[in-house]
Amino acid sequence: MTHSLRVIFAGTPEFAAAALAAIHEAGFPVPLVLTQPDRPAGRGMKLQASAVKRYALERGMAVAQPPSLRRAGKYPAEAVAALDLLHATPHDVMVVAAYGLLLPQEVLELPRHGCINIHASLLPRWRGAAPIHRAIEAGDAETGVTLMQMDAGLDTGAMLHEARVAIAPDDTTATLHDKLAAAGARLIVDALVELERTGALAATPQPADGVTYAEKIGKHEAALDWRKPAAALARQVRAFDPFPGGAGTLDGATLKLWAADAVPGRDDAAPGTIVDIGPDGVVIACGEGALRVTQLQKPGGKRLPAREFLAGAPLAVGQRFAPADAA
């Protein structure tokens, strides 16, 4: 089936690529794709194209990669060229998903139907850069995807559609990301079909109550604070997979802790102390309960199940991970 509604798409990572693929496969014309400039990545730090760029080029779509869209910003010449391209490209709506650049008011007002954002949370909870990580870290039972009519604020626009997704006890940011990407892809296609058919989408202002912000994840957050309850640390480990990973410092070496669950602890063990080692994992005392770590990684090594890790890097009961503020 083909559609007449013309969609400019702006997005960068895999989450966005899933939406672009769904829009394209549904038959909506995509005359232009905006994505972030290629970035150094991997061990060789070679320039790599975004997931959105790779998908678009493989299907012959026009791609632009401006470093900014602000005329008065750091890259005025590139911004002006991109804005001229947007003005010259006939379109009806812009769909934005994890793009990574601020859209000035000029861009928000350009499409006939405005700009629709695909946001990976149930707004107004978890506005901001890291909604998937923060939902897991906070212990939320569910999250979802919200389609929002973009305005000048940070994820403050009126809500158009939402889809709810349960957070499983073993979900990591990686697994939940994939569930939400699929949900967002379905949601945006349904919305575009409705927009084409009816000419408008019903919009509901976000409630003033329940607003929270999902701050960007920093590498410094990886260090586990063993004084916290084990349940909170288990959520942190899941929230920080694949980035930045949970981390603990033992005898001067930083170990990555990739999978863990909370188990009963011992009252006589100081937080950070290894209290048990077995084929099922390494058990570490916490402020409340204990954390059983089942997947570890030593510096320069690979992620390994505890049994394989211990075969090459023996640990001992009584060893103690350094406090987070001393790591």
Swiss-Prot record:
EC numbers for this chain: 2.1.2.9
Entries under SUPFAM superfamilies matching the protein: FMT C-terminal domain-like (SSF50486), Formyltransferase (SSF53328)
Keyword flag RNA-binding: no
Binding positions ((6S)-5,6,7,8-tetrahydrofolate): S121, L122, L123, P124
GO cellular component: cytosol
Single Gene Ontology MF annotation: methionyl-tRNA formyltransferase activity
Top EC category: transferase
Disulfide bridges in this chain: none
Catalytic activity: L-methionyl-tRNA(fMet) + (6R)-10-formyltetrahydrofolate = N-formyl-L-methionyl-tRNA(fMet) + (6S)-5,6,7,8-tetrahydrofolate + H(+)
Domain of life: Bacteria
Keywords: Protein biosynthesis, Transferase
Family: Belongs to the Fmt family.
HAMAP family referenced in this protein's UniProt entry, alphabetically: Formyl_trans
Function per UniProt: Attaches a formyl group to the free amino group of methionyl-tRNA(fMet). The formyl group appears to play a dual role in the initiator identity of N-formylmethionyl-tRNA by promoting its recognition by IF2 and preventing the misappropriation of this tRNA by the elongation apparatus.
Protein name: Methionyl-tRNA formyltransferase
